């Protein structure tokens, strides 16, 4: 009986994870909306990852300083 209940709970969790994936794709924000674009001072924002707005590459100069370089 416990095995059946465990199997049911595991399959319900897997199903809920599969259902959540398509919804997340629709919730992705552009770099401007999430604050990842800082073209005026050419600094990389931590939220934008290794990308910069003007298609420059983000170079980490130190732990506290990352700049967008060509």
Curated annotation (Swiss-Prot):
Family: Belongs to the neurotoxin 01 (U2-agtx) family.
Source organism: Agelena orientalis
Tissue spec: Expressed by the venom gland.
Protein name: U2-agatoxin-Ao1f
Signal peptide stretch: 1-20
PTM annotation (Leucine amide): residues: 69
One term of GO molecular function: toxin activity
One Pfam family of this chain: Toxin_7
SUPFAM superfamilies the UniProt entry points to: omega toxin-like
Major place of residence: secreted
Key words, A-Z: Amidation, Disulfide bond, Knottin, Neurotoxin, Secreted, Signal, Toxin
Domain description: The presence of a 'disulfide through disulfide knot' structurally defines this protein as a knottin.
GO cellular component labels: extracellular region
Propeptide, residue positions: 21-34
Disulfide cross-links: 37-53, 44-58, 52-68
Record's function text: Insect active toxin causing rapid but reversible paralysis in crickets. No activity shown in mammals. Does not show effect on mammalian voltage-gated calcium channels.
Subcellular localization: Secreted
């Amino acid at each position: 009986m416990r095995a059946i209940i465990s199997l049911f709970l595991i399959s319900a969790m897997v199903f809920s994870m599969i259902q959540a994936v398509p919804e997340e794709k629709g919730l992705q924000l552009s770099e401007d909306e999430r604050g990842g674009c800082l073209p005026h001072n050419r600094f990389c924002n931590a939220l934008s990852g290794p990308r910069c707005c003007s298609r420059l590459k983000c170079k980490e100069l130190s732990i506290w300083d990352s700049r967008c370089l060509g």
